[in-house]
Amino acid sequence: MALSISTLNTNGCRNPFRMFQVLSFLRQGGYSVSFLQETHTTPELEASWNLEWKGRVFFNHLTWTSCGVVTLFSDSFQPEVLSATSVIPGRLLHLRVRESGRTYNLMNVYAPTTGPERARFFESLSAYMETIDSDEALIIGGDFNYTLDARDRNVPKKRDSSESVLRELIAHFSLVDVWREQNPETVAFTYVRVRDGHVSQSRIDRIYISSHLMSRAQSSTIRLAPFSDHNCVSLRMSIAPSLPKAAYWHFNNSLLEDEGFAKSVRDTWRGWRAFQDEFATLNQWWDVGKVHLKLLCQEYTKSVSGQRNAEIEALNGEVLDLEQRLSGSEDQALQCEYLERKEALRNMEQRQARGAFVRSRMQLLCDMDRGSRFFYALEKKKGNRKQITCLFAEDGTPLEDPEAIRDRARSFYQNLFSPDPISPDACEELWDGLPVVSERRKERLETPITLDELSQALRLMPHNKSPGLDGLTIEFFQFFWDTLGPDFHRVLTEAFKKGELPLSCRRAVLSLLPKKGDLRLIKNWRPVSLLSTDYKIVAKAISLRLKSVLAEVIHPDQSYTVPGRTIFDNVFLIRDLLHFARRTGLSLAFLSLDQEKAFDRVDHQYLIGTLQAYSFGPQFVGYLKTMYASAECLVKINWSLTAPLAFGRGVRQGCPLSGQLYSLAIEPFLCLLRKRLTGLVLKEPDMRVVLSAYADDVILVAQDLVDLERAQECQEVYAAASSARINWSKSSGLLEGSLKVDFLPPAFRDISWESKIIKYLGVYLSAEEYPVSQNFIELEECVLTRLGKWKGFAKVLSMRGRALVINQLVASQIWYRLICLSPTQEFIAKIQRRLLDFLWIGKHWVSAGVSSLPLKEGGQGVVCIRSQVHTFRLQQIQRYLYADPSPQWCTLASSFYRQVRNMGYDRQLFIIEPEGFLRNLSTLPAYYQDTLKTWSMVSVLRQGATEGEDILNEPLLYNPSFKTRMLESISIRRRLCQAQLTRVGDLLDFEKSDWVDSQAVMQRMGFLTTRVPHRLLKEIKDTISPDSHTFIDGVLHAGEPRPPWNSSPPDIIIAPKTRQSPQAPPSPNLSQLENFPLTRFHDITRKLLYSLMLHTVHFLALISRYDTIWRRVLNEGERPQWRAFYSSLVPRPTGDLSWKVLHGALSTGEYLARFTDSPAACPFCGKGESVFHAYFTCARLQPLLALLRKLYLQFWLHFSPHVYIFGRPVSRDNKEKDLLSNLLLALAKLVIHKSRKQCLEGGNPLPAEVLFRVLVRSRIRAEYTQAVFTGRLKEFADQWAIDGVLCSVSPDLVSVQTILTLPYLSAL
């Protein structure tokens, strides 16, 4: 079903004729839903509208002269209207409707014309939208009276405060401007006014929809409305019924926890081995065997599901019955039984939701404390995002019929994957002079693939990936590899001999993922091959072999898939070239090549020939031939599959080998470019740059514009050899310096050339000193969008869960650009504040530094952006100093570093004192300024003595190893820099085979006498060790090596910089700087670097506070066992409570009394309620503490106030008992919290010790039910029946011990 939506500012409809005009216009358009603004309607006019319009009409009036919005439904659109709300009089009308099983929120908006009033309006709109269920779709149309895109207005307009509010609203609620999304380059307007000879045009009328509905949007148009100075904007989108089932079966990994299932699989496969002789080939036997496994899994799942549903139904009936019996009853025993049954039902609901969690791939959701509608909402949004509801045919005709859409997709990919003829001459030209694999590595590649290699490949494969057509997952193969592995190795050995894999391995499901652009164009869907796991095991094993030789045959300027190279090498190079060109006045052209369907157009014949040109052996080439022999794919369109089609061209995206094969395939083209193009040639620094490549993202660097024509010639050779295509019209470039478009060869003038900014590998780069602001605008929008998507989950997630969302799903989106660019402190602070707001959902109870500490140190591990940026800079220094071979950008970095204070130091900067470079960094680009500022935050210790050629490069200035009186003089240092005498080697005269004499030094330093130079030389010589003197004498005698000298990377240790607290720090505190291990900088890990930076950045905040506020009442001694609060048995929200208790992050009576009229007294005993009182000293808690002490004694464990508050350390030898004891402590705090909350809400809570017994018993019974269901009774007994303290277990019964029996039940 298609839905047509329109929006129009009518300029007033009070006149009956104007009303008739508007309604006739809408009928002609055939719109299902129409949003009208500025209607000037009043209640008296409603009858006229209802008589004239056949469908339903909804009004929101203001006055007969201003505002007014009306929403109309056509008579053919009759959804269920759940609510109609006039939110802001005359300006905002909200309809909540249900259609085809989905709920839509239709919002009609008319924004004010003045900036401040408009900003307040958007703030009110945002606040109201927060109340809407995030599970539901948003469709917002109307007159926004503001534009966000410069293309949407004919004359610039001064920005006002409403812009930032509107941008944040759009990002926060993941809204998409449909017309602009489908028409990214078109300029059109919806409002036109001509007055006094001036024309004002803008596109202020827009329709926004939720981003997950974008794939349903078929078209968006602007239609002239003759009676208004506004035009009508319309949207056509599909409304689908409830989602169908998946296109093919997927194995449910939760079955792997069932011992009965595991035994059935192993027994079935052992029996299947007896049927090998009944098949012509092992390939057939393997394929049919996997079908048997699939059927076994499906039958077992049906059986288990039926049993589980029956259990839940029975438990649900018990709870309903207890609810009826509780009506009007005050029977405490009945209440406890109800709570216990209710808790058991909730736990079972949690387990049932796991299937949804697995498909959503968010392990985070597994940590929620209950099954939630949010799980299913997230899945629905993901499913909608992948749905294709309309495609254009080749002639541009829109196709909406599902069968027509499938035919169009299959036809497109059949054409794409069909090979074209290739030119042998072009191939020979490309292959001529290629580097070859060494004989030693070649021999290794030629050996047969072993079972151990397959096993290693399987171990390295990531989890939670979509399976291939057989439905068997990576987890399935890993679990049953001991059974399946040897058989699969035999199948594979035979397959390689015959040159063909089993059919299930040859076939892939082509899943289409949306890209940017109009999703009605099939080319804007990215094909990813979902391959069977057994195929991926083989591909991974071959990939592990191949990666060891890539660096031998692929040039350093291509970094994709080559070990030791990263994408940042490419970005750093282009970034630094731009800065270098601007500083030196170079004129350069940067041309970014747009390659059309690069991975999908690689010709297989060309690929095999290229491998042979690299001198790969026949056995290894045979492996790759077999991997692609008779390959097929089935296109997945929504929830169906097309008929198979031959995969005759391209490398399979989704295959572990695809990236490596593509790098090998494009390398001959890049080699040809390097041979024929001049590129950029520099003498200082000594380097040549022709291109930078990351997979198919190739950017050419040209000083001579003739290089562009040569590049086109090279591309024509490459296209003839491999079927590759470069779309010159979509390629883009940057002209730096004096170059202009008019200077370019005619064929290149139609390319989109910029003079300031180029986007390369996702980063906006320019020659300006500071990064392009667009980078940070997009990052901020990205953060807001991500947090907005998860905002509905926030209160359901634990703090650990929210921290995981922040670190893995939000902050991780900004790291890429922050590694390459220097963000402002304002940007960092703003994003950090957003992240912490999401973590706390209210008051920030502890500082940002404490929140960022890892859990084991008392924090929640929320990433500190500032510390992470410093870590990135330290990692960049690591790569600069120690990368072997050194990336090209390091040469430019050295050139920049040598300009610092004219000292001529590059690597030597990192062994001198920071004062040597911090005073003046203005000669450096902003990125390298930040790098040196970060370096100044740590202390540097050098290991060992300076020996050999390194002594010649030893710096004289600010060098802790060269502490002389003369070198400490500021004047002497300045003169040495001016004279370019900054290293030991600079003081050697190779012509005289001696040290430079005092007279020469005097002249170069500008002194009038030799007294100071003589003394300076003497002090330097006296500082040098005898061994170094001997080496220098040998160098002078031999006359070599002469400058420039090659020095080895500095062997240094980094340590925290010594800092003093302004006052005596408490002990123990949260700072760990004094315990930081001294580590060689070459070997230090990213994790350790981050820890160092985190404690350095937040030093004062951490050293000035105790590790826990409980030090006020509990003496120094044991430390809190932070990780024990979130151990495997403890529910994460319960762990949050224990964590907050230790930090005092709870609203107690004394705290609230400081800010409100709430009483400070404890609601139970009347004494002052601090966190210490509420959770420890209150008289009502003593029976509970006594019960805990008794339980601990029965476990033969020590119980004390420290253990109760701080938790018990988990030891390896006593792990199960320690985990269980920590759970009891966590549940005790939970019942204290719940009973206190119930009391404050006016209830009559059960005693804390009674509620504790109920919770423990309920947990035991729920765990026992799960253990019986999964066949894991032994594990249950080992965990819960320790020493028989809590319960005893038999195959048919779990008996709870007397200590957990409620006292009043015993009395009864």
From Swiss-Prot:
Keywords: Transposable element. SUPFAM superfamilies: DNA/RNA polymerases (SSF56672), DNase I-like (SSF56219). This is Transposon TX1 uncharacterized 149 kDa protein. GO terms for molecular function: catalytic activity. The keyword Transmembrane helix does not apply. Residues 494-765 form the Reverse transcriptase domain. Signal peptide: none annotated. It comes from Xenopus laevis (African clawed frog).
